[in-house]
Amino acid sequence: LFPETIDSIRNEFDGLLPQENIRIWYAPELGANNETFIKVSELLREYFLISLNPDWLLLPTLFEPDSDKFIVRPSVANSEFPIEVFVHQITEIKDTQAYKNKATNLQQAKLCFTAIDLPVDKQVQLLGVKVDNIRKLALAPYDLKDKYNSQSIKKIFKDLSAQLLNQEEKTSSLSLTNKPKLAYVSPLPPLQTGVADYSAELLPELEKYYQIDVIVEQDHVSDVWINENCTIHDSQWLAENANEYDHVLYHMGNSHFHLYIIDLLEIIPGITVLHDFYISGLFYQRENTGIPNALNAELYNGRGYKAVKERYAYEDDARIVRENACNTTIIQQSQGIIFHSKYSSQLLQECYVPEMNVESCVIPHLRVKYNSDRESARKQLGIKPDEFIVCSFGLLGETKRNQCLLEAWLASSLSSNKQCKLIFVGKNSEGSYGEKIVRTISRHKVKKQVLITGWTKTEEFRLYLAASDIAVQLRMASRGETSGTVLDAMNYGIPTIVNANGSMAELAKDAVWLLEDEFENSDLVSALETLWQQPEKRQELSRKAKEIITTKHAPEICGKQYRKAIENYPKTRKLGNQTLISNLVPLISNESDKYLLQVARCLSQNQANKKVVKTLFIDITATSRNDLKTGIERVARAILLQLINNPPKGYRIEPVYLAEDEGSWYYRYARNYTLSLLNCPNDWLSDDVIDAQTGDILFAGDLAGGMVVEAEKSGVYCELRNKGVSINFTVFDLLPEQCPEMFPPGANLSYAEWLKVVCKVSDKVVCISKAVADELDVWVDSNSFERVKPLNINWMHLGADLGETAPSKGMPSEAKVVLKKFNQKATLLMVGTIEPRKGHLQTIAAFEMLWQQGFDINLVIVGKEGWQDLPDEQRRTIPKIINKINKHSELNKRLFWLDGISDEYLEKVYSSSTCLIAASEGE
């Protein structure tokens, strides 16, 4: 509401508070209806504060003079966080209703600091707050030092926190007669996914705390308990009745059974249990089941242009799916994330910035204890009592390293003993990997000793668990998933061999046989033979495994952790965007379209930061509009491509450009241009207005002159700075200022105006050499700017790798003949747009002298004719240069002009040249 004050506030707190911790909220402009403005603004502010999920809310002002003009209402009455208010004085307010509103709102405060020179009982009467909630502050300096110092205030907050925690614990211990309502969204049995079986085991435990409706997209649910204790609905029901629920819990895995959850989560926020960290296979299936570019969009959203580029560079999609996490949308839309391992939580921290406003926790995979009867299980499966059974549980696939186990078993002494069997309890891979396993079994003639069961029902799966002597569960290329089959084996007390891949590295070494992540085949052979030959070792592993399952993975323990996580995450189910919009609609339904757009924009800007990484915006306005393929544009392309291929850790790269709409200027994403530059299809993304947030960086890599000036007048850079975006410009030179005669008339004035804007709005200016940086420093000292703090001027060197600038291709038909002429004699080369300061006339005159003196050498000029959009009278010496070249007697003999050639051709010209002439003035 007061944009002109924000920059000074940020500067005041610089060094005391991270800039990312200064958050800005937005409200529409004050319209004709002041009452509507106040109500809309209060709603926007309240939900902005809720989205931050604060521990405390401190209001430093409420009853001060003119405070009725400000939006300072504490928050909604049902707020989940305590509020403290400072009351410095109470003045008469013209609008008595405004006073009453503030007094009513003050009653929400958990604590009221006052500096009013009145007895406490009088303050209670005036303010309407409880005596216990008032803390009187004296303003005398000595009193502040001795009585109300930082330690004293710290103690107040500490005591209140303890009081609130105690109150929370009392609430938690109350009888759950009115259980909150939970929508549980997950595939369920009989669907062939581990998440379905997991949910069937978890639901009875959650039912102790919640009234549960299950949301599925399947023909029927086979689990008896679920049918008897839960109401079953489909996703359409949830979409239409979401407000009936206190919480929504999503279970997200990597199979097609979870596709319907993606659409639900987009419109109904909830807590997501992420069973597979990557879930890229899910979006690949989404794209192949009727959602065009679903994988492209998720790759772009989460990994940026680099991942999209790689997709079209790879021969197939398998590699891109394997290498890239596609969970960004899920994480951004979730109120909180639950993982089953520390490994997945670690992946979250490694992949995304800590400032991302998403909470996460780790809840171990639960396992229900089953009373297994080994003898009965073996009898039902046809396994003899004296047979030694090694099992690997779960679907077969390359990441499960089943072939590795098979080869180790065949190499071990177990394979030569008829009483030993290897059983893969699961469905074989349908691709070449599964075929390889079958061929290996056939080749070694061990069909009677090695078995692949195919998909087994839950009852049969448990029989194999009860009948096994050893389990081997191997992994590679972990995607953050938790191996439920390892816990199954441990739950049944099966001595289990695993390798330290992903979350399995967290298993206790005395409860499993833990191999290195990348182990030798001989290591696995040794483990198999040792456990076969040493029953006491098997017994010890079995005992410890059961102990860990009982103490860490029991349903009662995990259920309590789920309840704590669900209750502790932001309760925005009934305070979320859907409710906010419902509350806004009656207030603004009769307003103009312009006003509605303002409100919509404020809604977007007020969202708590759920960017998974910060953004480095690269301003390529001039390059994307009319890429002249000349110096500055070539530099801009080269920097852009390098950043796309090697983004700084914690940042995504977003090329942007300035655009004008009805007098207002904005930055838009340069998606169409960038995808074309990367040789990717560009019809699936639009150039939307950018969404910048605190901690982002804008780097202007080319020269957009007048558009930058107009954008500054429109408030573009002020708004970015207010949001906490760092603004950085490149200055290539000061030549229009230093040599105005070398540029079109008036260019020095427009350039000076651009330079003043750059120096006014930038946090840092990057020059292309120390010499330019020194010149700019002098120029800044001789000009005055409205700046809060000094301008940071730095410099860098430019590179010269033509191949990394997205070079243009194409060779004219006469190229071979021309290049042959260059190779026949000494050839000197000039490269650059034909402009007054490039020294063409002087160079041609010098060569005329050399030719007259008998030197048989070539002069090659490569470059377009400059300033062609201007009349000749404004082009200085350019017409004279062009006329000189075109009418020269040596043209195409020993003087060559290659106008607008491709970069591919230019590289060959460089290779055929003897020397480069750099005749430019001020270069």
Predicted features and spans:
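Short hydrophobic beta-strand element within catalytic cores of glycosyltransferases
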Residues: 495-498
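Short alpha-helix at the nucleotide-sugar/activated-sugar donor binding site of glycosyltransferases
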Residues: 77, 489-491
